[in-house]
Amino acid sequence: EQYLATEYYNLPLLGQLYGGKGELNLETLLGSGAQVVIDVGEPKDTIVEDLDALQEQTGIPFVHVSATIETMGDAYRKLGELLGMEEEAETLATYCDETYAMVKDVAEHVEKANLLYITGDAGLNVIAQGSYHAEIIDLLSNNLAVVDSPSSKGTGNEVDMEQLMLWNPDVILFAPDSVYASVGDDPLWQSLTAIQNGSYYEAPMGPYNWMGFPPSVQRYLGMLWMAKLLYPDAADYDLQAEVTEYFDLFYHCALTGEQYEALMANSIGKQ
């Protein structure tokens, strides 16, 4: 709540069409007065059938707008057309285009780090190479998590410690609320190069996970953070200034220095 305007606090919670936190609440949706429902993100294999069925069931138009980290600018332009907010949308679209181009340029001029992004209460889930949730991980690192069937879920693919040892990354990024706080004192985790060297970090969280849970436009914060963390010389920008600009544009929030420091508390390594 500290990042969002109070006018948004009491909006109805509709649930999710996809994902792991529950189903779309049609009763709440029908009572909300919504004139259109727009789903933005990965086009699931059954997206057309799913949205057609919901549209028929509710009488409310359902629209899907595909969005990847590369095409997020175009997604905002489409949203602007749909909602009659072209000028506002273009501001956000331009930001997305320019930020993606800047970070992509960093990725193209560095030797990418051998890295894993780890999730889960036990730290035994990974976001696999080639999955929708891994877009910024794959862009900015050599994502060692190569599996036969990458999961489309934000919780990733379950593995075991033996597999983590075989991959043995140089850098580990932990999802918020994973095992970041305890691995430094765990002998088993200490067998991994990244933990031995202190090259492990917790992804920032606020108001959502910056690395993509959900995989929204907030991943642009994750891109900026990850590039600066891994390649500080190539990522020639002021991370705090970039984060502050994002919060202003997307949340209309004047991020304070204290708030920024809190967001970064576990995200720049053990001090």
Where are these regions (language model features)?
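Extracytoplasmic/secreted cell-surface and envelope-processing proteins
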Residues: 22, 45-49, 72-74, 124-128, ...
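Short, structured coil segments at secondary-structure junctions
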Residues: 57-58, 140-141, 195-196
